[in-house]
Amino acid sequence: MLMYRRDFLKSVTAAWVAFGLPNPLGGPFATNRVIALRRLGQSQRFDYEWLKEHARALAAAPYHSRKRVLPTPLERLSWDQYQSIRYRQDHALWADSDAHFQVKFFHLGLYFHSPVRMYEVVDGMAQELAYDPAAFDYGSSGLNGKRLPKDLGFAGFRLNTRKDTDRDFAAFLGASYFRAVGQEGQYGQSARGLAVNTGSSGPEEFPDFIAYYLEQPTSDADTVVLYGLLDSPSIAGAYRFSITNGDVLLMDIDSALYPRETIERLGIAPCTSMYQVGENDRRMGWDWRPEIHDTDGLFLLTGNGEWIWRPLCNPPYLRFNMFLDNNPRGFGLLQRDRDFDHYQDDGVFYEKRPCLWVEPKHGWGEGSVQLVEIPTFDETFDNIVSFWNPRNKPHPGQELLFGYRLYWGGLPPVSSSLAYCVATRTGLGGVVGQKRKYFSWRFAVDFVGGKLAALASVHDVSVEPVLHMTRGRAEIVSARPLHEIRGYRVMFDVVPLEDSTQQIDIRLYLRDTNGEPLTETWLYQWMPPILEERKMY
């Protein structure tokens, strides 16, 4: 599906807003009686190798869209009406077994026009599951299920545990989007099966999962396995997901991709998030809440072992960055700031939003982690994307294999002995009480952890900030203990060259007297304001 990103994500983001809330049908509509879903056709032999061959054959044929014209009542649903449609607990897949997991399906309508075929896999045999209007309670939607087509199909699905049928721990809905939660039980950023031409000058392509194969778990299984068949105008693919629910939810993913055409920018393991306003960027800070973001930084563990933190921004125009690497060890969008007082939102709880860490299972070779930051005026638009882009462009006839793990939760599963950044603040530079002779911008970067706590309590210890900038000059540079956080604060002013508004890339870390690094590397990209704005200060 080809669309401009803002139009597509405006709809998909809205549809995820209420995820993670209790399902009202888990209460009054829950019964002990289980109604088995109707099956379609004959069962057929199934495994991942079969799915890969199916995807390869799909890529060899011309693409055709599966988007359909829905009945008018479904097309005209408001968000509140669509959200009131709930899948009945007594129709949940595997509710009639002793499996630890259950599946509930999403209805088509509103923004979701492409039916996704659903299959159950039992003992290596797959059989399609039939849509049944009676499996849904239509709430306040005004819909009459008896008047809907019997072959309408499903939009997606969510996963629950038998112990908690009211809350889902993962959901797959819209194009190739999916989300999951850790112990915080809060949805936030999302992942996708694939990104195509994200951040390019033309329309972005949003591949669709056109079919899912749900493998029935055994009674003692703590992992649920499912498969996805992906298709789009330029590429097809087969995916295997092994999902283990826990304090940090783990998705072990294998993907096999088959291009139909040469792709300019392929994004592997894309993460999608939202950043409107934060400590370092208050350009859109007119809201009463101090901070509004799902994540506050991109975290990288490079192939050569460097730990990098790049705070996110809400730029005035689309901004694209690439971080060249060879066999990256991991990357992800993190929500490091976990203090409710910094957000003050008791409705969506941004401090509980999950981090998402991508860990390659094998060498991915040369390429780059790419970061796209898009301007947004409000929190309903996901404007942050990160993904891995292989150096070589994919061509028709190739098979591209990528295996990786996704970790959803409060913190990534990796940690360093180095100190890490906990806050980046910016504001007007200069010396308080003295008239400014020129414009400068102040940065205050806080580091904690590692050896800093011990060093902060010792007098006459030299900790040196190492600061590099691509242009401009730095002044009033300091690094001093900040006992309130048991760490260090680095402060410096950046003075842009003349009236240039060209971006300035900043690189910073702390080292000891022996030249050994004490902190991760902090990266930032600052856009100096135009000359007229500088004169205002």
Swiss-Prot record:
Designated gene of the protein: opgD
BP GO annotations: beta-glucan biosynthetic process
Protein name, UniProt field: Glucans biosynthesis protein D
Positions of disulphide bridges: none
Organism: Xylella fastidiosa (strain 9a5c)
Signal peptide: 1-36
Subcellular locations according to the entry: Periplasm
The keyword Signal is assigned to this record: yes
Function comment: Probably involved in the control of the structural glucose backbone of osmoregulated periplasmic glucans (OPGs).
Alphabetized UniProt keyword annotations: Periplasm, Signal
